[in-house]
Regions:
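N-terminal active-site beta-alpha-beta segment that forms phosphate/nucleotide-binding
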Residues: 1-112
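Residue-level signal for inorganic ion chemistry
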Residues: 11, 71, 118, 135, ...
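Receiver (REC) domain switch-region micro-motif
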Residues: 45, 117-118
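Short glycine-rich anion-binding loops that position phosphate/pyrophosphate groups of nucleotides
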Residues: 51-53, 122-125
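Short active-site oxyanion
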Residues: 69-70, 128-130
């Protein structure tokens, strides 16, 4: 069993060394994503603004918008909660305390039930669909109340055959993992 804190550090180090590979694989993952029934049936998707070592989300956002879908981004809230707000353009985003671009909060625009949520993470287990996220618990808290579809795009550096880490009672399975 690998301690999640150690695994997170190892994964960030590995992913930071493999940014170009992950970016290249992101193109293939997007191609696979748009062929899924979940994507085709969704009128709204939620994703994040990726950091430099994650699968790039800008092409995903652009594809969703060109397909006529509403795009929602997470806004971190107190008590490790998230609210999903509409993406308008990159200039309207503000940098959070975590250094992540987020939409400005507007209670009237919150959508906690987008049709499809693309779930980020650092490690994904193929045999069980569990993930290791960034450690804040934001997505697990959100997903515990969410009833829509979930997908994670998994580049090779995040792909684990089995969960070599402890699965906690609050860890939530991702419905579908898409591998390179």
């Amino acid at each position: 069993m690998i301690d999640k804190k150690i695994l997170r550090k190892q994964q960030i180090k590995l992913l930071s060394k493999n940014k170009s590979t992950t970016a290249d694989e992101g193109i293939k993952l997007l191609d696979k994503l748009v062929e899924t029934a979940e994507w085709k049936q969704s009128k709204s998707i939620a994703t994040t603004i990726s950091n430099l070592f994650e699968v790039p989300t800008k092409p995903i956002i652009e594809k969703a918008l060109s397909d006529g879908k509403m795009v929602y981004l997470p806004k971190t809230m107190p008590h490790r909660q998230m609210a999903f707000l509409p993406f308008t353009n990159y200039e309207d985003l503000v940098v959070s305390d975590y250094g992540i671009p987020e939409p400005k909060y507007n209670e009237k625009l919150v959508n906690q039930e987008p049709d499809l949520v693309l779930v980020p993470g650092l490690a994904f287990a193929k045999d069980s669909n569990y993930r290791v996220g960034f450690g804040g618990g934001y997505y697990d808290r959100f997903l515990a109340k969410y009833s829509g579809k979930t997908i994670a795009l998994v580049p090779s550096a995040m792909h684990f055959e089995t969960a070599d880490w402890e699965i906690g009672e609050y860890d939530i399975r991702i419905q579908k993992l898409i591998f390179v």
